[in-house]
Structure formats: C-alpha cells, structure tokens
From Swiss-Prot:
PANTHER family listed in its UniProt record: ADAMTS A DISINTEGRIN AND METALLOPROTEASE WITH THROMBOSPONDIN MOTIFS PROTEASE, ADAMTS-LIKE PROTEIN 4
Signal sequence annotation: 1-24
Ranges where the record places region Disordered: 73-150, 168-306
PLAC domain mapped to chain residues: 985-1022
Any one annotated GO CC term: extracellular region
PTM description: Glycosylated. Can be O-fucosylated by POFUT2 on a serine or a threonine residue found within the consensus sequence C1-X(2)-(S/T)-C2-G of the TSP type-1 repeat domains where C1 and C2 are the first and second cysteine residue of the repeat, respectively. Fucosylated repeats can then be further glycosylated by the addition of a beta-1,3-glucose residue by the glucosyltransferase, B3GALTL. Fucosylation mediates the efficient secretion of ADAMTS family members.
Protein name (record): ADAMTS-like protein 4
Any GO MF annotation of the entry: protease binding
Native organism: Rattus norvegicus
Claim: Signal is one of the keywords in the record: yes
InterPro entries per UniProt: ADAMTS_ADAMTS-like (IPR050439), ADAMTS_CR_3 (IPR045371), ADAMTS_spacer1 (IPR010294), PLAC (IPR010909), TSP1_rpt (IPR000884), TSP1_rpt_sf (IPR036383)
Quaternary structure annotation from Swiss-Prot or TrEMBL: Interacts with CTSB. Interacts with FBN1.
One record GO biological process: pigment cell development
C-alpha cells in the first residue's frame, strides 16, 4: 500500500513539473528560441503539379510552364506561431514594446557590376513605394574597352562605347547615400537592359538542377511604405505574377564592365535578375510582383513568359516552416497556338531589329540574325549588320521560346538550349528504352522468340503469329529460301505487306507507328525472307504465311514490356505451333521451357506466373484461386472454330472445388475465346466481288471470280475446282445498268443570222444531259438518237449594194520623184462583200462600174538627188570543200538617181565604209585524200616524152595516211611532147607575150600554156635541143 502511494505521489510531482515547464515556454515566446530551432530545415513533400500556363507566344512556337510547391510533411506540421508584426497581440506577461520609426535597410548588398547602374522598378501592389533616383546618376557612360572575342569575324578598327547615351546634367539635390554608391559604378539607362533578361524566367536546366526551396508565403504587412535600396537583383520582372523561386545557378557573366549592347526596352521598365544568380531569402522578401492577369507585352510584340501566382516564403515571418524538397519545382514544354502570318519575321529577326534605332560604334545599322554558331552560342542573340562582315552579341540569351536553330526541335529557355524528352518536357532527358517505355531502364523488357516448324496447312494465307502492341526490335525470318511469302496485316485485317493475293517488292512499309523492312534475298544466297522493325508498335499485328509449299521453318523474336496481366488473358499467339518459345528478361537469364522434339504445343504463351500470395481483398477471400479445368464445346462442327476456357474456384490447400464466393471475383481470368480445329468441312463455291459495270450508262456486264474453297483446321484455303464439281456453279457474269444513258437537250434558242442581208448561218447550243439533269460527255448520248442540228441556214432578204473604200496608204511607192498611193475599194451588200468575180459588179445585184472610186493616185516626196552607195554581190562558194576556206564577193560603187542605178568609180563611194569582200568559211569535215606535186619537165621535147610527180595520201591534219580510196589515186606519170621533131614553125606560131624570153630562160616551155603563148620562142628552143648531141 505504501509503495502504491509513493508511486502516485511521484506521478503527481512529475505532472506539476511538466505543467510549469510548458507555462515558462509560453511566457518566453519565440524570443527565447535557440538558433538551432530557427535554422532547422524540415523535410517536405512535393505537392501536385499545377495546371499548365497559357502559351507564352500568341503565334508560332512558345513555352508552357507548370509548377508545384514544397509542402511541410504532415507528420512534421507545427502549430502556428504568433506573427511578428506590431499589430499582432503580444504574449502574456509582456507589455507593448515601443516601435522606433526608422527606414528599413536592405539585407542584401549587391556586388558592384561593371555594366549598368542600380535598377529601379515600379511600386509594388502591396503598398510599397519607389524612391525616385535623381537623373544625375545617369550621366555616366560606359567607357569599358572592347575585349577580344566580343565580335565575330572581321575587325573593329577602333574602340568606342557601344551605345551612346545622352549626358544628363547633374542636379545638386542628389542624396548622398545614392551618389556615393553610384559614383564608382558606370550608370546605364534602363532602356538598354536586354529584353531577354526582362522576359527570361527562373528555371533550372536538368543538367544543373539542385535542391530548390519553395516555402509557403506570407505577404508583408500592407499599409507600410518601404523604401528599397536599388539593387540589380531586387526587382522582379514586370511580367511575372510572383517572385521568382530560388535558383541554384551562379551568375556566369563576368562582374567586369562589358560594352555589349542591351535589348532596348521602354523607359522605366522593370528588370529581372539574372536567372542563374543566387537568390536569398532577403531578396525574395524585397521583390514586388505584379498582380495576376496583367501581363506585360514587350514593344516588339513578343510576349514574356508568365507564371501563376502562388504563396512564397516571407522574410517578415521567419518563424514560418521552410520545408526542403529534392527535385524540380517547375516543368516546361513547347506549345503553339497557331502559326504566325507569313509576312511576320521570325523571333530572332524581331529581336535583332529592335537594335536598329540604337547606335553601335557611333552609327546605326540594320541588324539581321547571325545563326552560324555552335554550342552554347545558339541561345545568344547574335546579330549581323546587313552588308557587313562582322556580327555582335547583343544579349547573352534570346527570348524564351526561340528555336535554337531554324528547323530544330530544341528551344532556348533562359539562355540554355533544351531538347524535349519522350514525355514532351523540355530538358527532361527522358528517352524510350528498348521496349518503348519512356524513361524506362529496360528492367521491364522481355524477349519473346521461337521457331515455327509445323509443315503448314492448305495453300493460301495462313496466320502463324500474333504480335502485341508495344513490341519492338521485331525480326521474323524464314530458315531457307522457299516459294512461300510472309504477309503482314494490321487491325481489322488491313493489309500491310503482301496482301490481296499480290506480292509486294522488298522495301520499307510504314504502319502501326513503325516502319517494317521487307527483304527477299536472291535464292543463291541461301537465305529466306525477312521482316524486321525497330518499333514500338502502336497496335497489334498478325503475321501470315502465303503457303505454296511446306513450311521451311520460321524464326521470330520481339521485345515487349512485361505486362502485369496473367498469361491466360493474352490473345492467341500462333496457329502454326512453335517449336520453342522464350519469355525472359533481357538482363537476367531464365530457364527455357523444355519440350520433347517432334511434339507441338496447342498455344504458345509466356510461361505461367505462379499463383499470387494470400492477399485478402474486398471482393472475396484468399481461400481459393481460379483454375482452368477445361474448355467449352467448339463453336464449329468442322474446320476452325473457337472455344472458351472454363475456370473453377479451387482450394489452395486441398485442391477441392469451392463455391465462387471463396475466390476473389475481381481476380477471375476472362474467358477469352481460343481457336479450335475440327475435321475439314465440305468444299463450297466462294464468289468474289462483282466488278464494275462495263458501261457507265445503259445495259452492261459485270464479272466476278469464282473459287472452290474448303475449311480446314488451320483456316480456309482454295482447292481445285474439281472438288466442287458436284455443286451448282454460280454465275460469273450478270447484266447491269448503273443508270439510263443521257439524252440530247437544246439549251439555247437560235442565235441571230450571221449576215444582215442575203443568206447566212445561225446556231444554237445542244448538249448531252444525264438522268440527273446535269451535262455529261457526248459519248453518253452516242447510243441514243442523233442530236438535233446546232446550225442552219438563214435568209435575211435581198441586200442593197454600194462601193466602199479605205483610206489611202500612208507611204508613197517612190522615195523621191513621182510615186503611187493605193487604197482598197470593195462592193458590199449591207455590210457583206460581194461573192465572185469583181466584174460581177456590173450585174443587177452588183455595183455600177461607172461610179467605182479610184484605187490609185500619184504621189511625190520631192525631186530626186543623186546618191552613191556600195553594192555587194552574193558570196561565192567556199574555196575548200572541207576544212577552212574563204569566200569572196564583188563590191561595186553604184550611183542612184530616182529609180535609176549606174555603176560608177569606187572613188565616189570612198566616203562610205566599204563592206568586206572576203570572209572565212568552213567546209565539210575533211577526209583522207590524195595529194600530188607539180609535174616534172617533159623528158623529151618532141616525139613523146614522160612527166612524173609524187602522190601521197594525207589525213586532215596533213599527216601520212593509208585510208585513201585506191581507185581515186592520181597517176604518177603521163606522156608529153608527142609532136614530131624537125618541124619548122609556121606563120601561125607567134609569140603573144612580151615576156617570152623570160619564159625560155625559166624553162617553162615544157608547159602547154607557155608553149601556146610563146610558140615561136619555144619552137626555137626545141630545135636547138634536137640539134645538140645527146
């Protein structure tokens, strides 16, 4: 009893002590918390993904975002602590503390940066105001030198500030604290801030993702005016709905000055910190944000990315729990609302054109994109001035949503080129594994393979294999060449390869989400047909064999993802039974089912999965499991049919049959139909589809194909027609009439007569109209009655006649002197010409000749003056029958007086340019021909002598040849001086040339021409040669 009282007293004392400690903790409040409590970071859980934001661009390619928040784990949730605001109630036991009015100071002091001064943003929507910085702080200009590598190829001759800003007068009323902080830094107007920074979101590429925090938010107390210290990272972008989350990236840009031009923006636009600079909690608390629903559009029409507003951690409530989650807090994907108009430039061109009004190196340029870059430079805004050979990096990153390169799928986001993964998320890096699972590691892949060695059934198409959807790395091949053909059918029996009794050529065939390669090697190679595809397939396909001989054996294999369903739920795989089937993971090896050679399996399946463990469900107990005990009756009495498996609930322990309530109803396998085979059915006639009618209208004929078929266990097949000889043979032709043929219809009345008097022609439109009233071709009415006439003669009565004449010709027939002018005169009958001979005008129906107007008259352009001109004759024939030659023509000076021409002295035409008298010409291609020299002197002066010469065959280039025709070879000898000797010259033999003595000296008397010209001189020479002794 005393022991029990002692224990009771001890429990009471411990309870009182515990109450006292709790009261002291409540009185002290948060001011006595240890630093370890404040700095402790609880582990959180990711909340669900939010909705995808709207596309960032109204047309073309843009970016969509969605985010999730890191929430405190439910097991670590703490009661809310009293807020630290002056208007909040104080803890018990403490009075109100006096509030000292003072300007709040920034907890983050930005590092000095070479380009750009302090940035300013508009007032926040939660009550903050912005201090107006004096304009004197903007009077400094960038004076940094140009560094190597800043420009592209080509050289800049001298270094100047890239952009000139107007010097602003320094106002004396500038605050000291701002001037001291700015005088050491070059100032830059807000208008030169790059648009890419203004619009770039805070994101984390997957290759650089780190742990990010998304604490719950607590907005600052409204109503208090806060003065912000200017900071490069203090103001949030004007187009963002919320402060940007913490990023783990470091600013990769140099803190030194850079003369790079910045994207021009509107004056006073808000600036966004670099997306890769670290953001602290103090920065998050000092960023103001634009209320949702007020996006800001840049001047060039390019929309920035926006984010949905969500609560964030607040500096003014440091006691709020700050959970930490690992993983990404934001995802992005490409989007496109509608294509941009063709006349609108691409985004890069718009961004480059924004610098057309901004000076660079002291002058203005028209900028166009420069895309001949690689690597990380693809997401920089590199622009080239038109007509110049250098380019400039205007901004370090293009606007989000810009394509990395024209025609690529990669998109620039925050200066990084991100590629879409198989899940559509930019930068996810997910790729399908070997069995088509997006982001899979291949652990779920299973290789299914086997050999089909059954001899086969009847001739024709026979299904041999079923391939499920999602299969990849397919390969089906025959063991050796044969007359059989592999065929492929898709869902609904749609033919893919070798369908409709037609053999397709080898090649590529696209179907069910992949491309099948059909290969048929020559028989001498000793290889059979092959079907292969990389996959994965989007729908199941059936593999058939067109049997024309016994099956030589078929090997098949494919990779598929392991399905959680039981093997009995899979559709039938084969009708020709396989010799072997493997269902095993790709990485670990599994035992293969062993079967005695020569036996056949009824169905080829993945090996049976062991029965599941005892798991009780709401639909039934685990006392039994479903076991297949047989099949129903076959649905066909002959040929091929189907039956369904019968499942019973069997005890797991004793194997006895139980009632169905003892097994889980949801785990009962479906009774999928399976193929069954009965004895062959009697043959029957199978008629094909009727062909089109032989005529498009009227009676015609149709034909169809008739086959004798018989159903076997493996399916239907064509058999010889003799087997169906005892059956009545259906007709293979029949009469048909699609519609009545067309008829002729008059569609317009008669036109006016072609003449106003006399006999003429008139016409009307006649068309062939079908049964529906529409016009058809004339051949549709060819079988009917002839068409009504469309033309006929018409008589407009007698015509009145009169002479009609035209104007005189404008040119006189003579250039000078008297000439003739002509005009046309006709006799018309009410506007029509008189038919027949013009003399018919003298008849009663013609015009009287006595009143015919004259058709000629004299004309004169003035007296004629004598002129001279060169007259050229026709060119002569080419001097050479082949090869190059010359042509000549006669040129004379002719004087002209009126129509008279006289030949005169060439000196009268000397003032005129003389036409050429010679010109080169080209004959036909020269063939090899005979050439000969001059004849030698005659060997005797009388009583017959001999002359000789050389004869050679030369080619067109004057080289010796042997291809000249022998029958055209000139003779090498000829007789000469056949006159008798001792003849005195008669009186008729005289010299007709004064140069005969020279002819004698030159010994030219041997030639007939000179003998006749200098007869006497040559006769004396002949006499002297005869008198001289031999």
């Amino acid at each position: 009893m005393e022991l029990w009282l002692g224990r009771l007293w001890l429990y009471v004392m411990l309870l009182l002590l515990l109450l006292q400690l709790c009261q002291d903790q409540e009185l002290l409040g948060p001011s006595l918390q240890t630093p370890s409590e404040e700095d402790q970071v609880p582990e959180g859980l990711w909340g669900p993904w939010g909705r995808w934001a709207s596309c960032s661009q109204p047309c073309g390619v843009g970016v969509q975002r969605r985010s999730r928040t890191c929430e405190l784990h439910p097991a670590l949730s703490l009661p809310p602590r009293p807020p630290r605001h002056p208007e909040a109630p104080q803890p018990r036991g403490q009075g109100s503390r006096p509030q000292t009015p003072r300007d709040p100071q920034s907890l983050y002091r930005p590092q000095p940066r070479g380009r750009g001064g302090p940035l300013r943003g508009p007032a926040s929507q939660v009550g903050r105001e912005e201090t107006q910085e004096p304009r004197g702080a903007q009077r400094f200009r960038v004076r940094d030198p140009i560094k190597p590598g800043m420009f592209g190829y080509g050289r800049v001759p001298f270094a100047l500030p890239l952009h000139r800003s107007r010097r602003l007068a320094h106002k004396p009323g500038q605050p000291k604290d701002s001037s001291t902080a700015e005088e050491t830094l070059p100032s830059q107007p807000p208008s030169t801030e790059p648009a890419s920074e203004k619009h770039s979101p805070h994101m984390q590429p997957p290759e650089l993702r780190a742990q990010s925090r998304s604490p719950s938010a607590e907005t600052p107390r409204s109503g208090t005016a806060q003065t912000e210290v200017p900071s490069r990272t203090s103001s949030a972008p004007s187009d963002m709905g919320i402060p940007a989350p913490t990023s783990s990236f470091r600013d990769s840009r140099s803190f030194q000055g850079s003369p790079e031009p910045r994207m021009p923006t509107s004056q006073g636009a808000e600036r966004q910190p670099h997306p890769f600079s670290p953001v602290t909690r103090s920065q998050l608390s000092r960023r103001h944000w634009r209320p949702p629903g007020s996006p800001h559009r840049s001047p060039d029409g390019w929309l920035p990315l926006t984010r949905d507003s969500s609560p964030h951690w607040s500096l003014f409530a440091p006691s709020s729990p700050t959970p930490e989650c690992s993983g990404e807090s934001e995802q992005m994907r490409a989007c496109s609302q509608e294509p941009c108009p063709p006349e609108q430039p691409d985004p890069r061109a718009l961004q480059c054109a924004a610098f057309d009004s901004q000076e660079f190196m002291g002058q203005l340029y028209q900028w166009e994109p420069f895309t001949e870059v690689q690597g990380s430079q693809r997401c920089e805004l590199n622009c080239r001035p038109r007509g110049f050979r250098f380019y400039v990096r205007h901004t370090e990153k293009v606007q989000d949503g810009t394509l990395c390169q024209p025609g690529s799928l990669d998109i620039c986001v925050a200066g990084h080129c991100l590629s879409p993964g198989c899940d559509g998320i930019l930068g996810s890096g997910r790729r399908p594994d070997g069995c088509g699972v997006c982001g899979g590691d291949g652990s779920t892949c299973r290789l299914v393979s086997g050999n089909l060695t059954d001899r086969g059934g009847p001739l024709g198409y026979q299904k041999i294999l079923w391939i499920p959807a999602g299969a990849s790395h397919l390969r089906i091949s025959q063991f050796r060449p044969s007359s059989n053909y592999l065929a492929l059918r898709g869902p609904g029996g749609r033919s893919i390869i070798n369908g409709n009794w037609a053999v397709d050529p080898p090649g590529s065939y696209a179907a069910v989400g992949t491309v099948f390669q059909y290969n048929r090697p020559p028989r001498e190679e000793g290889k059979g047909e092959t079907l292969s595809a990389e996959g994965p397939t989007t729908q199941p396909v059936d593999v058939y064999m067109i049997f024309q001989e016994d099956n030589p054996g078929v090997f098949y294999q494919y990779v598929t993802s392991a399905a959680p369903e039981s093997p009995s739920t899979m559709p039938p795989a084969l009708q020709l039974q396989p010799e072997m089937l493997r269902g095993e993971p790709l990485l670990p090896s599994a035992p293969r089912p062993v079967r005695a050679p020569g036996t056949l399996q009824r169905q080829a399946r993945i090996p049976q999965v062991p029965p599941p463990t005892h798991v009780r469900t709401a639909m039934g107990s685990s006392a039994g499991y479903w076991k297949q005990v047989g099949h129903s009756e076959c649905s066909a009495s002959c040929g091929k049919g189907v039956w369904r498996p019968i499942f019973l609930c069997v005890s797991r322990e004793s194997g006895e049959e139980l009632d169905e309530q003892s097994c889980a109803v949801g785990a009962r396998p479906p009774a999928s139909p399976e193929s069954c085979h009965r004895p062959p059915c009697p043959p029957y006639w199978e008629a094909g589809e009727w062909t089109s009618c032989s005529r498009s209208c009227g009676p015609g004929t149709q034909h169809r194909q008739l086959l004798c078929r018989q159903e076997f266990g493996g399916g239907g097949s064509s058999v010889p027609p003799e087997r169906c000889g005892h059956l009545p043979r259906p007709n293979i032709t029949q009469s048909c009439q699609l519609r009545l043929c067309g008829h002729w219809e008059i569609s317009s009345p008669w036109s006016q007569c072609s003449v106003r008097c006399g006999r003429g022609q008139r016409s009307r439109q006649v068309r062939c109209v079908g049964s529906n009233g529409h016009e058809v071709g004339k051949q549709e009415c060819a079988s009917g009655p002839p068409p009504p006439p469309s033309r006929e003669a018409c008589d407009m009565g007698p015509c009145t006649t009169a002479w009609f004449y035209s104007d005189w010709s404008s040119k006189c027939s003579a250039e000078c002197g008297t000439g003739i002018q002509r005009r046309a005169v006709v006799c018309l009958r009410s506007g029509e010409t008189l038919q027949g001979d013009p003399e018919a005008g003298s008849t009663e129906q013609g015009c009287p000749l006595r009143s015919r107007p004259p058709d000629m008259r004299a004309c004169s352009l003035g007296p004629c003056e004598k002129t001279w001109r060169w007259y050229t004759g026709p060119w002569s024939e080419c001097s050479s029958e082949c090869g190059s030659g010359t042509q000549h023509r006669d040129i004379i000076c002719v004087s002209k007086l009126g129509t008279k021409f006289n030949v005169t002295s060439p000196s009268n035409c000397s003032h005129l340019p003389r036409p050429p008298a010679l010109q080169p010409c080209q004959g036909q291609a020269c063939e090899d021909q005979w050439f000969s020299t001059l004849w030698s002197p005659c060997s005797q002066s009388c009583q017959g002598g001999v002359q000789t010469r050389e004869v050679q065959c030369l080619s067109s280039n004057h080289t010796l040849s042997s291809r000249c025709p022998p029958h055209l070879r000139p003779s090498r000898k000829r007789p000469c001086n056949s006159q008798p000797c001792n003849q005195r010259p008669d009186d008729q033999c005289k010299d007709s040339s004064p140069h005969c003595p020279l002819v004698v000296q030159a010994r030219l008397c041997v030639y007939p021409y000179y003998t006749a010209t200098c007869c006497r001189s040559c006769a004396h020479v002949l006499e002297q040669s005869q008198l001289e002794p031999a």
